[in-house]
Amino acid sequence: MPSASITLPSEAEVVIIGGGIVGCSIAYHLTKRGINDVVLLERKQLTCGTTWHAAGLVSMLWPTPTLTNLAKYCHELYASLEAETGQATGYRRIGSVSLARNLERLEELQRNSSMAKVFGVESEMIDNKRLEELYPGINTDGIVGTLYIEKDG
């Protein structure tokens, strides 16, 4: 693909090296705070490196309240970016499931479900019948329980 001729400024208040999720987020949030003299440098194409290879999952539940609140903010931000920027983000809230194949893992998922309630994240422990309704064709043999977080993206 031919590269367009781009003239870079000789100086800027902020120069960000790397156009992955972190670099793009920093540039976005700086401009939201009124710092508009921002240059974002990426050697190829935005989000074409490590960010491009990531699964793109956005989980609502994390081990601390701070990380969980950050995840909630990210969900709200991703949901609004397309309307704000006119750029398709591909963000969808499709939910997530964590499966238990033994009692130890089931107890862990039950603790996570309790923690989710404390952090204000909607979650539920579901049985195999409900799991099959959500994911037709899934093999539930050996699954003793499932944590379902509907609003994960």
Where are these regions (language model features)?
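C-terminal lid/capping helical subdomain adjacent to the catalytic/cofactor pocket in oxidative enzymes
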Residues: 2-12, 125
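Beta1/beta-strand and adjacent pyrophosphate-binding region of the FAD-binding site
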Residues: 8-22, 39
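Glycine-rich FAD pyrophosphate-binding loop
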Residues: 31-52
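Hydrophobic alpha-helical packing residues
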Residues: 30-31, 116
